[in-house]
Amino acid sequence: MKLLKILMPLIILGIISIVNGYVIVIHPNTMNITNSSGVYNTDPNIIAYNVNDTITFEALAPDSVAQDILDNGVVKWDFGDLTETDYGNYRTTTHTYTFPFPYPVAWCGYLNNTGYSKALTYNWLVVGDVANTKYVFNGSPLNSKTSWEVYYNSTNNTVIIKYYSETPVDREFNGLSVDTTSVTVNVSRDEIVEGDTVKFNFSVSRNIIFCVWSFGDGTFSFEKFPEHTYTKSGLYYPRVLVVDDSGRVMVGYLDEGIEVKRARGGYIYWVTGPSHYDGEAYTYVYNSSGDDNNNNGNAYTDPYKITYKVNDTIKFEMSGAWGEYWKWDFGDGTETPYTYKSYFTPSYHQYKFPFMWPFFWMSYGWGSWWKSDTLNFIVVDDVENTRYNFYPSSAHDKTYYDYEYNKENHTVNLYYYSDVISTPKFNVKLRDGYYIDITATADKTQVSVNENVRFDCSPYGNPIFIMWCFGDGTCSFEKSPTHRYSSSGLYYPHVFVIDDNGNIEVGIPPPIGVGGYSSYPQIYASPTIAPTYYPINITIVEPASWTWYWHHIYFGDGGSVWIKPKKSPYTFTHTYTSEGVYPIYMKVYTAENMKTVYVIDNKNPIAKLYIYPNPASYKDTISFSPINSYDPDANRMIPEYNYYGTLIGYYPISPNSPMARIYGFNLTVYDSNGNVAWNYSSNELTIISKSFPIGNYTAKLVVWDGMGGVNSTTVKFSVINRPPVAQFIYYPDKPEPNEDVEFVSQSYDPEGEIAYYIWNFGDGTVINTTDTIVHHKYERPGYYTVTLTVFDKYNASSSISKQIVVGGILANFTYEIINENTVRFEDTSVVAPGKIISWHWDFGDGSTSTEQNPIHTYSKEGAYFVTLTVKSDTNLTDSVTKIVIISPPPKYPPVADFTYKVINGTTVEFNANLSYDEDGYIKYYIWDFGDGTPANTTTNPIIIHKYKKEGVYPVTLTVIDNDNLSDSRTKLINIGESFIHSVPIPPYIEILIVISTIFCFFQIIRGLK
């Protein structure tokens, strides 16, 4: 068969469809595609979508997440050629195709932080008569990598595609087919930031001769394994379209898409500057191009500007400070030496990896500035998108750290000594733009040269990295180090801490006076973040000589206290009754110092969970998105006071602070029996994905913030098996009786493979098979409804029915004898196409009829040859002859029965009126009264007989009908009272009793022997 020769190369284990101008539905209820006449078509035998037709695409929502995006978000279409829309209000759009081809069409979209992937929406749109078009694929390394040249000749149905290929390709196909085998798309990295180059590759078990990538940003590539640079942040869903060496067209999507993040960092987070103490001194920071970000303060800072980068030469400058000697501490373990003020010039420094480092300048002599007076932070490069891996070790040197910075992968590995943790901590994200002030102490603040000073700190969270800088250019990574200063001077130490939630913590102990230099009082508050009515521990640490001065402490809430500590350290408590930002200010003699406390009544975070798709296929990767969960405290305004307690404004709670940031989440998925099917935890809100078996599930999301607030939500979702789609064609389209008809399944399963097929050919023949091609012959012309039912491995099914016309005419009839010689004839002739318009009956007895269904009566018994001749409106004729036998009616015998009654003594009346004859009448009644008297024959059913003596008599009635057929009936009658309880036994019965008794006797004797 010609069709079979074309189809055989296309029969593979995957799902293949011969294609022609229709929609192949992979994801139902995701889109509506109509041609310019408003027609939506899934029938491959109808070419509804033509080249140059204006086709309308409408996005539909298969679940609630998609509905939210379509209603309130933005949508982007990928038409499967080299065309796609931007993100926008494109719920409905139009597109025109310029040559016949099977195109994968998909839409994607997003709302807030939640995206909807092309992998969840795509279907195939077959444009034009693809099955009957000749395709020439001409690949060359000389062709463009980013576009194709397509030549379409509609006269001879030829498409020539010229495209880039690493090796020359010259292949021809008579038609293309769609193969729903999945193509796996892979990318080279997880964390992608604008400006990053991403490597793509795909995998499929086919020999690919053509591929085209869509990167989702309007650019394309015909390389098999391209590299692409994303220049703008956003959500992108790449797609690859491939054709193999058998002309099978396949598509693959990156399920989760690519989130290209906006770089964030390269700015100054001002804590005490740039203006210090109302303009007494200033701090300035510039990059190597002279740009700043921003030396006017946090209100002007742009955290997305990336002004200060890795390996850039950054200039640090200050002005207006008191003191004779000045120095810089850059926070990364590097300091400048003290320089006399007349020679102090701007300092330059290079940072080697993205990080948020504290930096300070200090002075002493004729006035001094401490680290607590000048603390600010420089956020170097893209800290937001860098992941930090911490590798603590008790074997590492205690005085320095090592690092590895992988710019391409946005990772920093830190290797250092630790005595607080021993296991690595991976994928930590620093919370830039905020820090936590912690208590740091020294057991002595004035010592001799080389005298031991023991330092300690009280981290807010669980520390994973502790770095002490002692102010003399040396460091330690112990939590409570002991240090000796080798020369006299005034030293300003600090401790830098990172906790397991990525919080930056800094503690500044009092200055250390060495070799005759004096230290100064320092005040601390712990905790610096607390709810109302929580006792705040306030500690004064100072040299012994200062403990005898009166200290005036202002709490910022209008209250203050005078204290003469008389010892160091000295601790007392204070409680705040309302929310606010409160400075705790200490004035003692010529020294002053201040700490800030944030008092907030924490509001629990809001847990939000999006699950999509829902319902999902068992082949789908289900996305769980908690990223729209939020902490209502973020950016909430709380009062801010000066140290006198005067309201000076309102402070927006930083989204990166523990007060207003979700610190982590836990997702637990339960099956329908309540068993845990999956559990996942993270300290970062991120979309996670997983596939599940078919079933009903409940997902519970728990989120928590940095203040201990917890909230949860549950969402139900289901995983289903989408049924296969039944479709078939047959050849020839108008077969004749007994001609071989080839049926070809075009069915497909959007999730896998067809398990088996059931064909019902409409003529009583049904077959069950795993073959995609079957053959059948029809014996008679006519209209037959052929039904194909397909099943997948889960026994889900779908059916499609088509009518097949078997051409020709066939005369036939049935008949029924409705009484002795009358016959009803029924015409069962068929013709296709057309209809029968005349009937001629020859009944074989010289009679005829032109009725379609006549009734005829024969005059006598016999065998008759009945012939029916029919004629159609297409001038086809046919005849059929059958033998009709007219038989005499059957004769039924009579039925004998009677009753009797004793009239007087031994006189009995017998009544045979119960006897009857179905097809006639009874002529004679013959009575044998059982007393030896001669039989009595009569035509009267009633007769009287007198017995000579009492006794039991067998009375037999024989009846004879008009056809001389007979029947008999015998009854025992009892005559006389003396025989009521004693019935005489006939002699033959007595003989049988004697014989049986003798037989039993002998059997007993044999048993005894």
Curated annotation (Swiss-Prot):
The lineage of its organism: Archaea, Methanobacteriati, Methanobacteriota, Methanomada group, Methanococci. The keyword Nucleus does not apply. It is a multi-pass membrane protein. It is found in: Cell membrane. Signal peptide: none annotated. The keyword Kinase does not apply. It holds the Pfam family PKD. PROSITE patterns: PKD (PS50093). It comes from the Archaea. GO terms for cellular component: plasma membrane. This is Uncharacterized protein MJ1468. The chain crosses the membrane at residues 6-26, 985-1005.
